[in-house]
């Protein structure tokens, strides 16, 4: 715990690694967990597939758990 799953448009490996390290650091500082407890995955989604797979396939079905949606706070 925690497991952070990210879905995003394709990026190069260096960018994905930097983002994962920054997210890991935030969880270490804010969540207070050990480094061994953190798992982060990144799945690339083609822009043409985004709405079908992610927007309507996941986001719209899970709106009640969204903390930030379309760049706006939902808390």
What are these regions (language model features)?
Residues 2-75:
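A domain-level signal for the structural core that forms small-molecule/cofactor-binding pockets
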């Amino acid at each position: 715990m925690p497991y952070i799953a990210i879905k995003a448009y394709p990026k190069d490996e260096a960018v994905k690694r930097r983002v994962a390290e920054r997210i890991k650091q935030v969880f270490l500082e804010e969540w207070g967990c050990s480094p061994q407890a953190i798992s982060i995955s990144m799945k690339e989604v083609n822009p043409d597939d985004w709405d079908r797979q992610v927007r309507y396939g996941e986001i719209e079905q899970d709106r009640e758990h969204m903390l930030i949606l379309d760049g706006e706070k939902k808390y």
